[in-house]
Amino acid sequence: MDASTVQELLRGGYEKVYEAGAIIAGGHTIHGAEPIYGLAVTGFLHPDRVLTNAGARPGDVLLLTKPIGIGVLTTAQKAEMLSPEGQALAERLMTTLNKSARDAMVRYRVHACPDVTGFGLLGHSFEMAQGSGVELELNVDAIDLIPEALEFARMGLLPAGMYRNRTFAEPGVDAGVIELCKQDLLYDPQTAGGLLMAVDPADAEALYRELQGCVPSAQRIGTVREYRGGKRIFLR
């Protein structure tokens, strides 16, 4: 890897850190066979303003801020099967911060908010349901599944992480009659995925409208219910 490529990597990282309102305060170098780049975040947060993946309440409305399918797209890219349009979409989604969604969210009553990353939508939903002592109903038709990712899922082109996520969460999921390829995408590990918000029903419509102004891909995907025993997630 030449010096100009390294320079571009560092510049891109700096620009995103600056966009998030933070600063680069140091660094270190790792020698290895493959180039890697990452960031560790250190900061302070008022304990009364912490949002975790627990705290969702029955009646809450579930909002999701990004489409699903990034893991499948990046797997297809490694196999040199991804279209130029798919690559551009993946890059745009992965380089879009959750800052705008977060800035909108803090003005409303949001009871829980994991980011959807390596465990996929169903993995993080399962953790939220367990941690909150509730169950979730997800409307699969309302979830923005990336069309090209869905086609790859139908072909069986899936990341290894999808299978691990399925093993983890599937015992707690009632998939109903949902098509298998759509289930696969719901387990797809996301890189730089969106936020999954459990919103007080009195605030849900107003927050949803505000999110649509700054996060066009925002979706209203389900509801939180009282836990009745048994499964935690119900796909409809």
Model-identified regions with their sequence ranges:
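Helix-biased detector of long, well-ordered alpha-helical tracts
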Residues: M1-R236
